[in-house]
A protein has these predicted regions:
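Surface-exposed, low-hydrophobicity beta-strand/loop segments enriched in small/polar/acidic residues
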Residues: 1-115
């Protein structure tokens, strides 16, 4: 046997060591997921690993179809500095998906198709 089908895979099980809020971006080595609900520390929850999400972004232009990366230390247009943001810069960041639409540098989010 080479493989056994488990499930569709839109979400994965996740048990955080500290509490996670709905909408938080979570990186597990090279896999980016987004919490769809609050998850208490040490409690089983799930992360979306596919779908389309509005993600806080760095102040930059991102073109539809561009690869989008998660910068864990990024400064979002409308969020807390250093709390993380989506970016088109690959260096030192984790691939999360592709931009669905053009994003202006002044937009607070980029619409991302998770991959």
């Amino acid at each position: 046997m080479q493989a056994t089908y488990i499930k569709v895979g839109r979400e994965i099980d996740y048990t955080p060591s500290s509490a996670v809020s709905a909408g938080d971006v979570v990186v597990q080595v090279n896999l980016v997921g987004i919490a769809t609900e609050d998850i208490a520390a040490s409690a089983l929850g799930s992360l979306a690993v596919s779908g389309i999400f509005d993600v806080d972004q760095n102040a930059e232009i991102i073109v539809a179809g561009d690869a989008v990366y998660w910068d864990a230390d990024g400064n979002s247009v409308s969020g807390t500095a250093g709390a993380g943001a989506a970016t088109a810069t690959a260096t030192d960041n984790t691939f999360m998906g592709y931009a669905q639409a053009l994003t202006a540098a002044t937009d607070s989010y980029v619409r991302v198709v998770l991959r």
